[in-house]
């Protein structure tokens, strides 16, 4: 499902193209060449996804079965919207029955079946607005949030891990029992306190680096499966429609003991 085309792509464009020097800086030219020759970029265009990141989510789902049966999904750091496209398709979300809420401080072009909030997720109002937008208790919270890079690896790691941590605590506050949480992190280790919190609240916690992540990238994904539920209801303190526990996928049993952290 997520393997890139071999020896080219199905659009007829050959890979390995060079970009003329012109007025571009060497670093910009290298980035552009890498982008136009990336088979996942080509495939995203062919299959109608807004970004190559779609294949990261599809690849993770193919192995770990986190989307099947999901009735409502919240997408954090959603721009340009490829994960939201997948979420809308999985949930059957429509403009008349919204089941996907997406948030990003960057502007996003509208997507059918997706309620988009142009807002920083760290805004204190964001959690309540997301829950209002999604129309009920989500089965899955996905986050592709990353802080703007500074070029200093330790600083970038700390800033992105803060976003991951905030997203994780939000997921624990809002997820349906049996739900799943997926978030971007960086190589260099997830903070012990965050891992311990997730292990207390989910049945399985693993790190993943999908093949569709660029080889030179330090990004990884933190997946927490099987939310155990809250003892005292929704921690955000407002009424939402509860569809009950997320339907169990028997395929999860086959991977329950894999790659435990």
UniProtKB/Swiss-Prot annotation:
Specifically methylates the uridine in position 2552 of 23S rRNA at the 2'-O position of the ribose in the fully assembled 50S ribosomal subunit. PANTHER family: RIBOSOMAL RNA METHYLTRANSFERASE, RRNA METHYLTRANSFERASE 2, MITOCHONDRIAL. Pfam families: FtsJ (PF01728). Residues 233-261 are annotated as: Disordered. GO terms for molecular function: rRNA (uridine-2'-O-)-methyltransferase activity. Keywords: Cytoplasm, Methyltransferase, rRNA processing, S-adenosyl-L-methionine, Transferase. It comes from Allorhizobium ampelinum (strain ATCC BAA-846 / DSM 112012 / S4) (Agrobacterium vitis (strain S4)). Its EC number is 2.1.1.166. GO terms for cellular component: cytoplasm. S-adenosyl-L-methionine binds at residues 81, 83, 104, 120, 144. Gene3D superfamilies: Vaccinia Virus protein VP39 (3.40.50.150). The gene is rlmE. This is Ribosomal RNA large subunit methyltransferase E. It is an enzyme of class 2 (transferase). It catalyses: uridine(2552) in 23S rRNA + S-adenosyl-L-methionine = 2'-O-methyluridine(2552) in 23S rRNA + S-adenosyl-L-homocysteine + H(+). Belongs to the class I-like SAM-binding methyltransferase superfamily. RNA methyltransferase RlmE family. The active site is at 184 (proton acceptor). Residues 245-254 have a biased composition (Basic and acidic residues). It is found in: Cytoplasm.
